[in-house]
Every structure is written in structure tokens, then in C-alpha cells.
Design a protein with these regions (language model features):
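Loop-to-transmembrane alpha-helix initiation sites
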Residues: 10, 68-69, 114-125
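Hydrophobic, membrane-facing alpha-helical anchors
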Residues: 14-21, 68-84
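Alpha-helical transmembrane segments of multipass membrane proteins
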Residues: 19, 23, 45, 49, ...
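Membrane-interface helix caps and helix-loop-helix hairpins in membrane proteins
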Residues: 27-30, 61-62, 87-91, 112-117
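Small-residue-rich segments of transmembrane alpha-helices in multi-pass membrane proteins
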Residues: 39-49, 72-75, 99-112
């Protein structure tokens, strides 16, 4: 079972990593910003921690799978992400924000189970995607920012 320090480290790392992604969304005035991304990741991290805790307590009494709760989180995030997507004038806005919410949920789950390298690398890749690929799209495809 995890000690208090491990639990705190996992929650704080979840906050920091998702905060970086949420800050980018906030700076660009998207529908879901800093607080939403942090809360979503923290909730996902807590759910994973709770799943691991339950598994540790009852592993000898019943067949349990900690991944089942995580799968429920990912399904639930789909509904939350759908709320960030707006159909407007024949176009769709908010897809990138919806995807970033899904990614921070995954980061929260990864930090919750101690999969730090994956969480860190995913955060780096997400930030590269959000910051730099925006400019690549403009240069290569003449695509203007549509998601507001």
C-alpha cells in the first residue's frame, strides 16, 4: 500500500503536468482552461489511487481489476469533452480542447499508478503539439485558429 508521501507526490505531479497543458489552453482563451484541466487530472489521479487502494485491501477476497475503474474514467471524459465541442456556422470548434481534456485524464491516471515517465513524456508531447504544431498548420496549410 502507498504511504502518504507517495500519494502526495502523485497528486502534486498530476496537478503540475496538467497545469502546464491547462495554462496553454487558458492563454489561448479556450473553453476549458487551467482549473478545468487540473481538476480533471486530479480527479483521474484520485480515482486511480482509490482503485489501487481498493485492490490492495481486497485482492485476496474477490477478483478485482484496478484497470476497470480507469476505463470508466476514460469513458466519462468523453462526455465532458463533448461539452467542449461547439458546432458553429458549419464548422466544429473545441476538438483540440476536448482532446486535451482526454490527455490530462490519461496523465492523471498515469501519475496515479506511478507511471511517471509516461506521464512526463506525454505532457511534453502534448505541449509540443499544442504550441508548435499550431504554427506548422498555419505555415503548411494556411489554417487559421478556429477554436475559440
Amino acid at each position: 500500500m502507498l504511504n502518504d508521501a507517495e500519494i502526495i507526490i502523485r497528486l502534486v505531479l498530476s496537478l503540475v503536468l496538467s497545469g502546464l497543458i491547462g495554462l496553454e489552453r487558458q492563454i489561448h482563451r479556450r473553453t476549458a482552461g487551467l482549473r478545468t484541466h487540473i481538476l480533471l487530472s486530479l480527479g483521474s489521479c484520485l480515482i486511480m489511487l482509490t482503485s489501487l487502494y481498493i485492490f490492495a485491501i481486497y485482492k485476496n477476497e474477490a477478483p478485482l481489476d484496478p484497470a476497470r475503474i480507469a476505463a470508466g474514467v476514460i469513458t466519462g471524459i468523453g462526455f465532458l469533452g463533448a461539452g467542449a465541442i461547439i458546432r458553429d456556422r458549419g464548422g466544429v470548434k473545441g476538438l483540440t480542447t476536448a482532446a486535451s481534456l482526454w490527455v490530462v485524464a490519461g496523465i492523471g491516471l498515469a501519475t496515479g499508478c506511478g507511471f511517471y515517465k509516461a506521464a512526463l513524456f506525454t505532457t511534453a508531447l502534448a505541449l509540443i503539439t499544442l504550441y508548435f504544431l499550431r504554427y506548422v498548420e498555419r505555415i503548411m496549410f494556411g489554417k487559421e485558429e478556429q477554436e475559440k
